[in-house]
From Swiss-Prot:
Gene3D superfamilies: 3.40.50.1360, Winged helix-like DNA-binding domain superfamily/Winged helix DNA-binding domain. The keyword Transcription regulation applies. The lineage of its organism: Bacteria, Pseudomonadati, Pseudomonadota, Gammaproteobacteria, Enterobacterales. GO terms for cellular component: cytoplasm. This is Transcriptional regulator LsrR. GO terms for molecular function: carbohydrate binding; DNA binding. InterPro entries: NagB/RpiA_transferase-like, SorC_transcr_regulators, Sugar-bd_dom_put, WH-like_DNA-bd_sf.
Length: 319
């Protein structure tokens, strides 16, 4: 007797079975075991018929929620860029996007970090907001922190909010040295090298993503690490964004022959590959191209962004 004829003591064809199973499962909230007992089928048969119902189109799930668009974007971006994790925050008018991104990233880290694990942190407003929101969790779970670059000042707005007992390794050097020679000397200092090696061994990392078209709103410019003239020149060379001060083009390739790259003290972007989870935190439609480039370059494998930015990213990759 085939699956498409009468297949049980109830005299139901397969399509009717699927319909009844779907109704019991989704409408009445019965478990697959309860359905199998009610219809005289094995639990495995119930599971297979549910799956067949989805594949055939008999079962269609509709989510009526303001989060539906976010979930669709998450699924599309996760599949397109092979992301480990992604969170798209729903659009809220007049909301502080930086604050919301920090909260979203903090939640992602709280779900993934285990007690006493090591978290590497890049500089930037979004990452520091994340640390503020994580402060209680960091203390309770004894999470250890390490900075990904030099520069004490850019980190203090976040690290300064932590309990004094928290374990924090800060790179004892500036983010950018005054020359390539001085940068090389500092990188070779044992105290600096030890922190860099510790950062490479982190269980997870969180980084901000800057966009060249942010102009005077870019964190690296506001912090005084590049001048407006340098920003213009870097943009003319094809840069669309940066992570940790390293600028890359739309394909995620590092822009060659840029002075700042030789003067930075911290992990290079290709060194992030040793860290299992690298979360990029960035929002605002002007950052869409930079976020795409960061994912194409495989510098991040997880993302926290907002709904409008995710929509812009989808629009750009579908062109």
């Amino acid at each position: 007797m085939s699956d498409n004829t009468l297949v049980s003591d109830y005299g139901m064809c397969e399509e009717e079975q699927v319909a009844r199973i779907a109704w019991f499962y989704y409408h009445d909230g019965l478990t697959q075991s309860e359905i199998s007992e009610r219809l005289g089928l094995t639990r495995l048969k119930v599971s297979r018929l549910l799956e067949k119902g989805h594949q055939s189109g008999i079962i269609r799930v509709q989510i009526n929620s303001r989060f539906e668009g976010c979930l669709e974007y998450e699924n599309a971006l996760r599949n397109h860029f092979a992301l480990q994790n992604i969170r798209v925050l729903p659009a809220l008018p007049d909301a502080d996007i930086g604050l919301r991104l920090g909260i979203g990233a903090a939640h992602m880290l709280m779900e993934s970090l285990r007690p006493q694990q090591l978290l590497a942190v890049g500089f930037g407003e979004a990452t520091m907001t994340t640390l503020k929101r994580l402060s209680g969790f960091i203390s309770a779970q004894q999470i250890r922190l390490v900075t990904l670059s030099g520069g004490v000042g850019p980190y203090m707005t976040g690290i300064g909010q932590l309990d004094a007992a928290c374990s924090v390794s800060i790179m004892p050097a500036p983010l950018r040295a005054s020359s390539q020679e001085i940068a090389c000397t500092l990188r070779n200092e044992n105290s600096v090298r030890d922190v860099m090696l510790t950062a490479q061994a982190a269980d997870a990392a969180i980084v901000g993503i800057g966009a060249i078209n942010q102009k005077d709103q870019a964190s690296i410019l506001k912090s005084g690490y590049i001048t407006q003239g340098e920003q213009l020149m870097i943009g003319r060379k094809g840069a669309v964004g940066d992570i940790l001060g390293y600028f890359f083009d739309a394909h995620g390739e590092i822009i060659p022959d840029i002075k700042i790259h030789n003067e930075l003290i911290g992990l290079k972007l290709n060194s992030l590959s040793t860290i299992p989870t690298v979360i990029g935190v960035a929002g605002g439609e002007q950052k869409a191209e930079a976020i795409i480039a960061a994912m194409r370059g495989n510098y991040i494998n997880a993302l926290v962004t907002d709904q409008k930015t995710a929509g812009k990213i989808i629009q750009l990759i579908e062109k």
